[in-house]
From Swiss-Prot:
Transmembrane annotation, as ranges: 29-46
Signal sequence, renumbered to the chain: none
Cytoplasm keyword on record: no
Lineage: Bacteria, Pseudomonadati, Pseudomonadota, Gammaproteobacteria, Aeromonadales
Family: Belongs to the GSP C family.
Cytoplasmic compartment residues: 1-28
Gene Ontology cellular-component annotations: plasma membrane; type II protein secretion system complex
Periplasmic side: 47-290
Record's subcellular location: Cell inner membrane
Keyword annotations of the record: Cell inner membrane, Cell membrane, Membrane, Protein transport, Transmembrane, Transmembrane helix, Transport
Any one of the GO BP annotations: protein secretion by the type II secretion system
Organism: Aeromonas salmonicida
Keyword Amino-acid biosynthesis on entry: no
Protein name as it appears in the record: Type II secretion system protein C
Function: Involved in a type II secretion system (T2SS, formerly general secretion pathway, GSP) for the export of proteins.
Amino acid sequence: MTLPFRDDLLSSLLARCKTVPLSRFSQPLFWLLLLLLAHQCAGLTWRLLDLGSQQSSQPWQPAVAGSQGQGKARLDLGGVSRLALFGKAKQQARAADAVAADAPKTQLNAQLNGVLASSDPAKSIAIIAHSGVQNSYGIGDFIDGTQAKVRQVFADRVIIERDARDETLMLDGEEYGKPLPKQGNPDEKLSSVRSELLGNPGKITDYLNISPVRVDGRMVGYRLNPGSNPELFNQLGLVANDMAVSINGLDLRDNAQAMQAMQQVAGATEMTVTVERQGQLYDVYVGLSE
């Protein structure tokens, strides 16, 4: 019974709406909708402008890759500084004169029989006898049977390190306490000697005495001894009574090879002389720079 009543009421409302003139409400409704649309557009515009101003106020920063939770990135220049792009300052080496001046005469029972003092320490050689055994030693070598180490080689002495202090071992026959000889360039000295001998071969006896040695009529070598000027002899690392048996690998005991060796020596700027010393063979390098 309620349904017909509701249907009648709905039909009555629809009939009344049809009688209302829509033109009276269409224009006000249009302006209301336009006003709402303008309000929404204005709000959206202000939001966009506000967002742009916030982004422009912050300075640009590059993106820094890193794990979450890290603090501000810091540029580490330590690796660049360790590259030493401009080189490293060289530490001043201890002067040889100061070492020699502070080195007392050694009490080591050893004898310095020969030296080859070179401007290149790696080529310097000292011939030292200890406990009846003679050997050649370079800088940094320990003398056999001792805790003494060769530190420096000069023309008339050797500085050794023994019991954590420097000591002086003088060349046999040289007096301790004499001034340290000035360190000239051995190559320059040898070059001047070479020029002198080329001009006057007879001057060789000033530096070196050479005498052939024969046993049962057979050539066994050439005996070498210092001349009136023994400095060069000692600098070459030769020892009195050394016997030369070859030059640059050519056997001086063979006549043909000996002649070939002499021809090489005439124009050579360097050579290796093999000498026999107390039953052992030693190579002596001789540089005759032009």
